[in-house]
Amino acid sequence: MVKNSVISVIFQEEKKGSVEFQVFNFTNKIRRLTSHLELHKKDYLSQRGLKKILGKRQRLLAYLAKKNRVRYKELINQLDIRETKTH
């Protein structure tokens, strides 16, 4: 499973405060909220929370892309995230 392999890689290399770990946590929250919203389409509070988390993850990814392009590419490949058009 992709999740377990990514967790092991992140725990071996980085600490919990690292950008990669934060993006990983946001990605898990996004996937959980997305599956929740498929069942509860009118849960507007969860929709708002999802948008906030998406924004936070986007800002962290932009920071990582600016600071270390190689780590950014590896992370989006591991988490199966699409690259934004601005990067």
From Swiss-Prot:
One GO MF term: structural constituent of ribosome
Database matches in PROSITE patterns: RIBOSOMAL_S15
A GO cellular component entry from the record: ribonucleoprotein complex
Keywords, in A-Z order: Chloroplast, Plastid, Ribonucleoprotein, Ribosomal protein
Protein name as it appears in the record: Small ribosomal subunit protein uS15c
Any single GO BP term: translation
InterPro entries: Ribosomal_uS15, Ribosomal_uS15_bac-type, uS15_NS1_RNA-bd_sf
Subcellular location: Plastid, Chloroplast
Signal peptide: none
Pfam families per UniProt: Ribosomal_S15 (PF00312)
Subunit annotation: Part of the 30S ribosomal subunit.
Lineage, top ranks: Eukaryota, Viridiplantae, Streptophyta, Embryophyta, Tracheophyta
The family this protein is said to belong to: Belongs to the universal ribosomal protein uS15 family.
Entry annotated with the keyword Ribonucleoprotein: yes
UniProt-listed CDD domains: Ribosomal_S15p_S13e
SMART domains: Ribosomal_S15
